[in-house]
């Protein structure tokens, strides 16, 4: 069985890794310009495929059947070829609901605020409504509720980010500060790269129930597999694939005083795991064209810390590395947050 993901830009997609981890079918990534979507839908040689931005609505007119949840949300992310034509489904609903449930987040009777008004916003709104939310408010850049009047929503209890703000490579950004929502008790962010966005880090610092979007991505893929080949992938298998992928994309960060052996341990871990190791002091030296002692001697510690901050900010965005930090790097709360 040949399956695929279609979208415009798929360079950073995890979908192939996830679907092939289920071990049920081959799976390819197919980047398509908009003017080739119709041709693919009508003549493509894939038995089934997922659809990502910006084509979740584009594919709908080509489907002879659209499932109730896809009609309700207004987008299709899963298509199968049948003798009766193309059948479209939406598995994001299942994925989002599963993510919230795993995080222990209950929408019943809650005041929910959704950041963003795109397709994923509609999914979040549908799930929250079906789960009994008391009030659901969508915040957009130009809507009645926007980022200039968030004080009107200070009673928010569940905050959901469906915007791309904070997504790789713009790590460290957040559409809002949780200080604007003093009653917030749960946060969901559909972004899965990075594993923990700035918004999720704010929630973790406050002890608020939260989840990033990676579990949603794996759960919706499992539901897609059900449509692809009638496979029943349970919670244990979803959890296994999620944990395996989360471990693969996280960096291993070594901290400690100078001379404690971080570089030696990094080299040993590199041999053991096959991961690439990176030393932040080496990155600083490469950028400056001189050694760390010479930087301290000629320009002082403040200049070195500026170079170190730039190095950490850049390397922390990457995935699956072993990062050996300088002795004073973790004295900065900003660095500690970035490296997580």
Question: Which positions does each model-derived feature cover?
Answer:
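Adenosine-phosphate binding glycine-rich loop
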Residues: 190-250
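ATP-dependent small-molecule kinase phosphotransfer cores
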Residues: 282-331
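NAD(P)-binding Rossmann-fold cofactor-contacting core
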Residues: 131-147, 281-287
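Phosphate/diphosphate ligand-binding glycine-rich loop within oxidoreductases
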Residues: 2-103, 194-196, 202, 206-209, ...
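Glycine-rich adenosine-cofactor-binding loop
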Residues: 7, 88-93, 100, 105, ...
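Rossmann-like adenosine-cofactor binding region
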Residues: 145-211, 326-333
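Conserved small/polar residues in nucleotide/adenosyl-binding loops
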Residues: 334-340
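Conserved lysine of the Walker
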Residues: 262
């Amino acid at each position: 069985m040949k399956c695929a993901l279609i979208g415009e830009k798929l360079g950073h997609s995890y979908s192939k890794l996830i679907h092939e981890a289920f071990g049920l079918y081959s799976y390819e990534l197919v980047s398509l310009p908009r003017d080739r979507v119709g041709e693919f839908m009508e003549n493509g040689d894939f038995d089934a495929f997922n659809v990502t931005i910006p084509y979740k609505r584009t594919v709908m007119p080509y489907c002879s059947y659209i499932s109730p949840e896809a009609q309700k949300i207004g987008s299709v992310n899963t298509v199968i070829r049948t003798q009766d034509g193309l059948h479209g489904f939406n598995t994001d609903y299942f994925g989002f609901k599963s993510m919230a449930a795993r995080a222990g987040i209950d929408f019943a009777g809650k005041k929910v605020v959704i950041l963003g008004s795109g397709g994923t916003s509609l999914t979040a709104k549908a799930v929250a409504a079906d789960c009994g939310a008391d009030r659901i408010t969508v915040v957009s850049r130009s809507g009645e509720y926007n980022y200039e009047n968030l004080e009107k929503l200070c009673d928010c209890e569940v905050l959901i980010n469906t915007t791309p703000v904070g997504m790789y490579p713009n790590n460290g950004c957040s559409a809002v500060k949780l200080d604007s929502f003093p009653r917030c008790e749960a946060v969901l962010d559909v972004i899965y790269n990075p594993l923990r966005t700035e918004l999720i880090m704010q929630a973790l610092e406050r002890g608020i129930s939260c989840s990033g979007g990676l579990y949603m991505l794996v759960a919706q893929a499992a539901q897609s597999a059900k449509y692809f080949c009638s496979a029943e992938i349970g919670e244990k298998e979803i959890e296994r694939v999620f944990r395996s992928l989360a471990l693969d994309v996280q960096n291993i960060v070594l901290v400690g005083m100078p001379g404690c052996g971080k570089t030696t341990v990094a080299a040993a871990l590199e041999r053991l795991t096959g991961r690439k190791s990176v030393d932040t002091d080496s990155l600083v030296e490469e950028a400056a064209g001189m050694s760390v002692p010479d930087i301290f001697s000629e320009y002082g510690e403040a200049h070195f810390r500026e170079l170190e901050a730039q190095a950490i900010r850049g390397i922390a965005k990457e995935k699956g590395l072993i990062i050996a930090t300088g002795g004073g790097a973790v004295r900065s709360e900003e660095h500690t947050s970035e490296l997580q």
